[in-house]
Amino acid sequence: MYHIGQGWLPTVAVALSATFCRLLPLHRLALGPRLRPASAWRAAKRLQQLAVPADVRFNAPMFLKRLECSACGLEHDPSRLQNLCRSCNKPLFTIFDLAAASRTMTRATLVTRERSLWRYREVLPLPADVGPVSLGEGGTPLLRVRTFADDFELWIKDESLNPTQSFKARGMSVAVSMAKHLGATKLAVPSAGNAGGALAAYAARAGVEAHIFMPRDTPRANIVECRELGAHVTLIDGLITDCGAEIARRKGNEGWFDMSTLKEPYRVEGKKTLGYELAEQCDWQLPDVILYPTGGGTGLIGMWKAFDEMQALGWIGTKRPRMFAVQASGCAPIVRAFDAGEKDAAEYPDAHTIASGLRVPKAIGDFLILKILGQSNGGVIAVADEEMIRFARAVGSSEGLFVCPEGAACFAAFKSLRGAGKIASGERAIIFNTGSGIKYLDCYQDQ
């Protein structure tokens, strides 16, 4: 048996295999048919010539036009560090010149690009001559789920395979890249767990400071992760909103740049790559239904932004999935507001749930989430903690995936919506598992 480095043939085979797997379009890897061996060899040989090492950026021009308030439309200068709108304190969105971007980024050119979120470089804000802060984020699998589906087509987008084992890596890669580029040296974030770990990792990679404020009852794995990655960790008696308030109180004197959810404009740009990847993996035919675990809602908001951009690029049509926000029964501000027909969500009192990513009593992007749910003819559903544990175990024992409680909540939601007739037979539904169950071991003790 040959080992790597023993003879030329296995070395070439390994190199071609790695190149082929990294650069083959995502929908081929996840959904499409296998290529014939001869075709695969020719494709691998061609793609090897075009291969881009993971740490090397594409020489793509930047098409960022402006920053614009998502509520009042006021423009802001993208050449400076920005937080919320200076007029109305609402989140800022990045606006791109999509007509110009479409000249260098097409569905065909994506075939030659590395399997990471930076494959969509033209619709990301970092200048072309600046290297991203990257740990290989993006390119996560889309897997068919058969156990719970019956005559439904159910898939899971497994974000636990990102660096730091959660979808938060997407947002932090882009946001830390931009913060460093614009001169920030000290970054701060309130976190229920996964955002803190992601900031700690990407700040370490970028050579900047990370200051993370977490509720004292955050799962221990998340706290240890942040500390071992070199971050300054402060534990607070309270919720994530209390952590955010402490950052707001101290950031001026400490020189911190606030990286809170939607309080800077670039985490959502990283999260929107969920939408681009999903469309690519589905061969540019969006699913009928998306079930998304919703705390701060950046992923849901980002995907909707991606769908609008892809339509402008001519990559997809006008069809949109019905978006369902899945929350915990013990912290369901979006569920309560949607059911009441409100445009904003009031702070949820006495918030509690084992799903730390869903324990967000007040989301700054609530008005955006509620607008998307209405536009998509989607809806909301709240899931009890006991159901999260039950479905996490069911998914693990039947599908081989150790999902986080937030992801498990989506499986419970799917079953409920299917039973209520809100997902029809034959429709394609996609569940997002936003993190690894390994980070929530405290939840499964003595259960």
Labelled PLM ranges:
Residues 9, 46-50:
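Cationic, low-complexity basic patches in intrinsically disordered or flexible, solvent-exposed regions
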